[in-house]
Amino acid sequence: MAGRYAPSPSGDLHFGNLRTALLAWVFARHDGRDFLMRVEDIDEQRSTMESAERQLSDLSMLGLDWDGDVLYQSSRHDAYRAAIAQLDTYECYCSRRDIQEASRAPHAKPGMYPGTCRELTPGQRAERRAGLAAQNRHPAIRLRAEVDSFTVVDRLRGEVTGDVDDFILLRGGQEPGWAYNLAVVVDDAFQGVDQVVRGDDLLDSVARQAYLCTLLGAAIPEYVHVPLVLNARGQRLAKRDGAVTLREMLVDAPLTHIISSLAASLGYEGISTPVELLAVFDPGALSLEPFIFTGLNGSATDRMDK
């Protein structure tokens, strides 16, 4: 049994990222699971090894330990290719504009691929493939889904039913890249991850990922979608909101104060280490409302419901 944290190395981790990492760690340790670390660096244009090293250093500094070696998605291309070979897929030649225009059609579901390329003839595929090649572009690869919805059980939210469409497994364009939905499912199965704690902004993708688990013969993990950290304007916290990364906060506050603020955002006062939080952590007491971050000197209990 294992939980995991899987940051994308595109910059330093901010207060919201650190809070989710702490929750992933404390859920896993509370339940007696191993805690694994994975670097989701398949987006080569945004990912850097420097960012990965800084993130891992920050998490270690915070007091989060993990079991085994760090897994880098950039080393997993063969596994993703093997997974696609097991699935019923087809090439998609649509541009983003094509999909946006199709979504405006009557009865179209927002955010759902309408299946434009699903039933093309071999001749139509050859013609469209040649058209993309002339632009030095590659088609995307989509899953040929046999369901339009899927239900999972989230530990905090109960049954969650989400839409499933013919979602992308391999992005097209001039530089093809593996899609998050494919990589995360393949890697969770490979690592034996049976608990996924992450931000609730990813709740919309859980049905697709759980359905993909069934197609690949992988067990569906326990999902725990935790609330995000928002800024004072009610928007998702971002690095542009000021001194919110660990290294920035350490300029003005000791590490114990930062950990105390993280724990207080979860409803626990007087905590100065993750181990202290683990000793008193109650998964059932976790608020489902977003936390409003107003700085380390702001109220540690500001939530949308107060």
UniProtKB/Swiss-Prot annotation:
Superkingdom to which the source organism belongs: Bacteria
Short sequence motif named 'KMSKS' region, residue ranges: 236-240
BP-aspect Gene Ontology terms: glutamyl-tRNA aminoacylation; tRNA modification
Keywords of the record: Aminoacyl-tRNA synthetase, ATP-binding, Ligase, Metal-binding, Nucleotide-binding, Zinc
Enzyme Commission numbers on file: 6.1.1.-
Sequence positions that bind L-glutamate: R4, Y5, A6, P7, S8, E40, Y180, R198
GO molecular function: ATP binding; glutamate-tRNA ligase activity; zinc ion binding
Keyword Metal-binding tagged: yes
Family affiliation: Belongs to the class-I aminoacyl-tRNA synthetase family. GluQ subfamily.
Protein name according to UniProt: Glutamyl-Q tRNA(Asp) synthetase
Keyword Transcription regulation: no
Function as written in the Swiss-Prot or TrEMBL entry: Catalyzes the tRNA-independent activation of glutamate in presence of ATP and the subsequent transfer of glutamate onto a tRNA(Asp). Glutamate is transferred on the 2-amino-5-(4,5-dihydroxy-2-cyclopenten-1-yl) moiety of the queuosine in the wobble position of the QUC anticodon.
A cellular component term, taken from the record's GO annotations: cytosol
Binding site for Zn(2+): C92, C94, Y113, C117
Species for this entry: Corynebacterium efficiens (strain DSM 44549 / YS-314 / AJ 12310 / JCM 11189 / NBRC 100395)
Cofactor: Zn(2+)
Cofactor annotation comment: Binds 1 zinc ion per subunit.
Pfam families: tRNA-synt_1c
InterPro entries for this protein: Glu-Q_tRNA(Asp)_Synthase, Glu/Gln-tRNA-synth, Glu/Gln-tRNA-synth_Ib_cat-dom, GluQ/Sye, Rossmann-like_a/b/a_fold
Motif segment ('HIGH' region): 7-17
Annotated residues for binding of ATP: K239
